[in-house]
C-alpha cells in the first residue's frame, strides 16, 4: 500500500498528469500519423490539450481555495491547545527542516512551524518524563539542533527512524507503550494523521499548526491568482497528494470491513 500511494500520488499530481498526458498524447499522434488513423491523431491532440489545461488550472492560486482549504477543515480545533490535558508524549510529524552542508546548520522550510509548536507544547507540559518523538532520516542534523535551541532536553527525544509514513509511525509509537499523545502536524495533514493514530489505539490531542492553505485563501484575490505560479503549483500539488492519500486509506478501510 505504501508504494501504491506513492505511485498514485505522483500520477495524479499536476506534474505527473502533464508528463503522462503529453507523453501518451504524443505517442497517439505519432501512431495515428504512421498508420493513417486520424481518430488516434485527434485523440492524441485532445489528450495533450487536456493535460496542459489541467496543469494550468492546478497551477493557479485561486484553485487552492477549493482543494486546499477544505483539507484543513472545521474538525481541526482552532484554540490554544496549551490549555488541554497532559499526555505521555508530544509527537512531531515531519518538521519542514533540512540540514545545510554548506553553512553547517539546519534550514527551516515552509512547515517548520511544526518544530516550534512541538517545542512550545513540550515546554508547557513537561513534567520530567514527557517525551518528544521524531521520525525520518537526518533529524539529528536538522530538527534536533533547533529543538535544543528552543529549550527541549535532548534526553526527552525519542526517535523512530524506520517509519516511512504516518501510519507506520503511529503503530511504532503505540507499540512503544505510549498511550496518549499531543499530535503536532500541519493543519491540512491533521485529520488523516489523527485518524491513523486513533486507529493504532492511541488517545490523541490534536495540535494543528501551519495553516498555509487558509492563509493563502485569506489574502485578497488578485489577477495573478488566475495565472500559473510556482507557489500555487506547490500548494496544489500538496493538496492533491493529501486527497489521494485520504482516498487510498478510505479504500483500505472499506476493504477491511
Per-region residue spans from a language model:
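Membrane-embedded alpha-helical segments of integral membrane proteins
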Residues: 1-31
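Hydrophobic alpha-helical segments of integral membrane proteins
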Residues: 3-8, 63, 67-71, 240-247
Amino acid at each position: 500500500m505504501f508504494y501504491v500511494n506513492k505511485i498514485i500520488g505522483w500520477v495524479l499530481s499536476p506534474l505527473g498528469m502533464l508528463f503522462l498526458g503529453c507523453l501518451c498524447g504524443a505517442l497517439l499522434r505519432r501512431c495515428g500519423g504512421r498508420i493513417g488513423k486520424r481518430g488516434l491523431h485527434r485523440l492524441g491532440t485532445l489528450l495533450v490539450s487536456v493535460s496542459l489545461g489541467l496543469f494550468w488550472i492546478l497551477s493557479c492560486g485561486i484553485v487552492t481555495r477549493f482543494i486546499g482549504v477544505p483539507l484543513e477543515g472545521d474538525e481541526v480545533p482552532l484554540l490554544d491547545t496549551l490549555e488541554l490535558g497532559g499526555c505521555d508524549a508530544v509527537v512531531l510529524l515531519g518538521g519542514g527542516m533540512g540540514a545545510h552542508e554548506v553553512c553547517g546548520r539546519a534550514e527551516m522550510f515552509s512547515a517548520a512551524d511544526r518544530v516550534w509548536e512541538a517545542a512550545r507544547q513540550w515546554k508547557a507540559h513537561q513534567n520530567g518524563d514527557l517525551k518528544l518523538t521524531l521520525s525520518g532520516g537526518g533529524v539529528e542534523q536538522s530538527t534536533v539542533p533547533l529543538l535544543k535551541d528552543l529549550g527541549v532536553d535532548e534526553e526527552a527525544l525519542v526517535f523512530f527512524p524506520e517509519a516511512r509514513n504516518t501510519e507506520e509511525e503511529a503503530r511504532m509509537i503505540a507499540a512503544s507503550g505510549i498511550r496518549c499523545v499531543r499530535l503536532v502536524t500541519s493543519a491540512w495533514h491533521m485529520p488523516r494523521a489523527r485518524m491513523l493514530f486513533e486507529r493504532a489505539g492511541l488517545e490523541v490531542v490534536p495540535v494543528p499548526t501551519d495553516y498555509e492553505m487558509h492563509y493563502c485563501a485569506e489574502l485578497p484575490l488578485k489577477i495573478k491568482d488566475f495565472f500559473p505560479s510556482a507557489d500555487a503549483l506547490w500548494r496544489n500539488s500538496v493538496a492533491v497528494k493529501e486527497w489521494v492519500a485520504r482516498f487510498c486509506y478510505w479504500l483500505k478501510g472499506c476493504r477491511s470491513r
